[in-house]
Amino acid sequence: LANRVFADEGFLDAAREFALKVASKAPFSMQLAKEQLNLSAERTLDACLTAELEGMMFVGTTKDWQEGVDAFAEKRAPIFKGE
């Protein structure tokens, strides 16, 4: 699955910028998104939606989720710790 195309010129800078953006996200959320994507070809839509809901319910119990809410309310960048 590809979601970006970069020109040869500036490729490394663009790829690095994209990687840093992904790395700044909450680890549990990114891990669950990757797992969902990898398993989606083997599941029905209903099974995918159920698993996504379960993942969202789990993520909502983490310290990183609260950090995201707090950071949004305080208009600052979140600092995720994988907790």
Q: Language-model segments: which ranges?
A:
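C-terminal long alpha-helix characteristic of the crotonase
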Residues: 2-50, 80-83
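Terminal low-complexity tails and localization/encapsulation signals of metabolic enzymes
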Residues: 70-83
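Helix-centric, low-specificity signal for extended rod-like, repetitive segments
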Residues: 27, 68-69
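Interdomain hinge/lid region at the active-site interface
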Residues: 64-65, 71
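Short alpha-helical scaffolding segments that buttress acidic/His motifs in well-ordered protein cores
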Residues: 33-36, 56, 72
